[in-house]
Each structure stands twice: as structure tokens, then as C-alpha cells.
């Protein structure tokens, strides 16, 4: 993705920002000169996150320009990040100051191990109260799953209009998705279909209908987006943000609009309990949750939750309003679902 093009879209989003001044009593006050100076003495902040490198780089550059503090960024999946931080915590040699990734793993591991420190900065006032966790603070973005399609292969009129339309036999062999015997997010998505259909029985019937289409099963949703964008398959189960990600590259990608429910995952950012650079970490959390960082993320298609900021995707406001957090499962429940879906999709 070209840096010049990315910042062009970001600039347009920045022009439309609205700042909310109402706050909540328990938030930290605006950052003091003392904190800024202490953070500058530390000189760096180490961040483990799941944002794509180009998006994170734009955010990190903004922070570095504003404060003169270097950001060292490591990108990984939620599983990789949590495993690494857990290992470091256990060894008493924490290298990371900040973690940001999907909400459920962060909640689970914090309850089990106490890996994180509570810090809710003044920039959190720009989020709806219902999206603010008492410990972690705002759910800063939602990674939302829908159905994307290649407009050169399927016209908007021909595209599915509902979950029921997706399992029409005419899409047999023409849809790609994450492999539900391998890909965590796809497993979570399928296991949450009761939130779409209102009952587990109807959800199970729909899942079997999806499997009957003999979808192309891939390692994750990233290659699903690639295959749809390239025209290898016309339809895919993937992140709605790919409409913007691939559209910016000239690919004719659209998504099924107007669904009653869009499932997905929330994301948190938190300081580690033993952060080597705690002052720089606080400063980074405040910046990350602020309007500038949110605009950068929205500009490349992310569904950020700071009020009034949307990605440049048609119908984005409806997607946000229709978002439902995917179900959380215990390890045993997850493994059971994984085996169940392996059997269903291998028939």
C-alpha cells in the first residue's frame, strides 16, 4: 500500500473529525508536563500489537513526531502475542510496555495471570460508555466479518442480500473462507451464528448449508481477501475492511450491505503490569486512543469506535450499529467446536 495514497485518505478523514469534550469522573487527567518529561527520559516504548505494519507505522510516526519517543513495534497474531507476553511475565523479564489485540484473549489471560495494569487516559472520553471496560478502558476498534464479493464477477444486484442467500446452491464452489479446523476467528464466527439466527438449531442448519457449498478453505481471512480481489473466487467470508484495503489498490471489491448482524471481535490496548517504560506507555495509550490515531486507522478501513469516526466504506454506520461481539468459549468448548466443524466441512 503506497504511503502517499494512505495519508491522502487519512487527511480527508482528519478534516471531518469532531471532538467531544464531555468526560467521565474516573478518567486520568490530561497528560502533565511531568509525565511527558519522564516519558522522554525513558526514550522508547515497546509495543506488541495485531495491527498491520503499515497502519501501525503511521500511528507510531505520529507519536514519535509529537513526543520524540521511539516506538519499537512487534506485530503478531493474538495467540502469538499473548503466548510471548505470558512467557516473559512468567520469567520476570518483560520486554513489552504495551499490548493491543483482540479483547477476549486479553481478558482471559489477565484474569488468569494478572499481566496488565489498569490505565484509562483522558482520551477515553471520546468513546461511548457502553464500549468502555472498567479495567481495560475503550474497545478501540471492532474487527468485523461479513461477505465480500468481486464486482467484476458478481453485480450488486446478483450478490447475496442475507445470510440465507449466501447458502443458495448457486454459490457452490464459488465461495472462500477460513478453514474452520485451523483458523481461530472462523471457529469463533461459526460458533456465534446463534446471535444471527436466534437459535442454535437454525444456526447449525445454516452452517451445514455453508459446508454443502464446498467452499475453498484457506489458512485465514487474509488469503480470502486476496482470492476475491484477484477474481479467483467471486465471494468470500472475510473482514468488511477489505473493501477499503483492496479498493485502494484498484480491486473491484464490495460487501453485502444491510445485514441485521455483523459478527466480530473488539480490541483493547493495555499497559503490561511490569512495563519497562511505564511513563512512555501511558503517553502512548493516550495518543493511541485519541482522534489522530483513530483517524489513521479509519482511513485504511478499520472500524474504530471513537465517536463520529468511520472508515470511508459505504454503509459503515449501519455496520457499526449492527455489530455483535462473537461468543467467548472455554478451551474445552473451543476444541469441541473445532472438531465439530472439521467433521462438517470435510464431508
Language model region names:
Residues 311-347:
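Extracellular/periplasmic bilobal clamshell ligand-binding domains
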Residues 104-109, 229, 234-254:
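A ligand-binding cleft/hinge motif common to bilobed small-molecule-binding domains
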Residues 46-60, 72-89, 94-232:
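Extracytoplasmic ligand-binding site segments that recognize negatively charged/polar headgroups
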Amino acid at each position: 500500500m503506497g504511503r502517499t495514497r494512505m495519508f491522502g485518505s487519512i487527511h480527508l478523514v482528519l478534516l471531518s473529525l469532531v471532538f467531544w469534550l464531555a468526560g467521565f469522573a474516573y478518567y486520568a487527567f490530561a497528560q502533565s508536563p511531568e509525565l511527558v518529561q519522564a516519558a522522554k527520559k525513558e526514550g522508547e516504548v515497546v509495543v506488541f500489537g495485531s495491527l498491520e505494519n503499515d497502519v501501525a507505522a503511521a500511528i507510531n510516526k505520529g507519536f514519535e513526531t509529537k513526543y520524540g519517543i521511539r516506538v519499537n513495534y512487534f506485530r503478531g497474531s493474538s495467540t502469538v502475542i499473548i503466548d510471548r507476553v505470558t512467557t516473559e511475565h512468567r520469567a520476570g523479564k518483560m520486554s513489552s510496555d504495551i499490548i493491543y489485540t483482540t479483547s477476549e484473549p486479553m481478558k482471559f489471560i489477565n484474569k488468569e495471570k494478572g499481566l496488565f495494569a489498569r490505565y484509562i487516559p483522558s482520551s477515553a472520553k471520546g468513546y461511548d460508555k457502553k464500549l468502555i471496560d472498567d479495567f481495560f478502558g475503550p474497545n478501540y476498534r471492532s474487527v468485523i466479518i461479513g461477505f465480500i464479493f468481486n464486482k467484476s464477477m458478481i453485480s450488486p444486484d446478483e450478490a447475496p442480500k442475507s445470510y440465507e442467500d449466501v447458502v443458495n446452491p448457486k454459490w457452490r464452489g464459488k465461495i472462500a473462507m477460513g478453514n474452520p479446523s485451523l483458523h481461530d476467528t472462523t471457529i469463533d464466527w461459526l460458533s456465534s451464528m446463534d446471535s444471527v439466527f436466534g437459535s442454535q438449531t437454525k444456526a447449525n442448519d445454516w452452517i451445514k448449508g455453508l459446508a454443502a457449498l464446498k467452499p475453498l478453505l484457506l489458512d485465514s481471512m487474509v488469503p480470502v481477501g486476496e482470492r476475491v480481489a484477484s477474481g479467483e473466487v467471486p465471494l468470500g467470508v472475510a473482514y468488511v475492511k477489505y473493501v477499503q484495503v483492496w479498493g485502494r489498490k484498484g480491486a473491484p471489491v464490495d460487501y453485502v450491505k444491510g445485514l441485521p448482524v455483523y459478527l466480530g471481535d473488539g480490541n483493547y490496548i493495555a499497559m503490561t503490569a511490569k512495563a519497562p517504560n511505564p511513563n512512555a506507555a501511558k503517553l502512548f495509550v493516550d495518543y493511541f486512543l485519541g482522534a489522530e490515531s483513530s483517524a489513521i486507522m479509519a482511513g485504511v478501513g478499520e472500524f474504530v469506535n471513537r465517536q463520529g469516526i468511520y472508515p470511508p466504506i459505504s454503509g459503515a454506520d449501519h455496520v457499526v450499529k449492527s455489530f455483535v461481539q462473537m461468543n467467548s468459549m472455554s478451551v474445552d468448548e473451543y476444541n469441541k467446536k473445532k472438531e465439530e466443524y472439521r467433521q462438517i466441512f470435510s464431508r
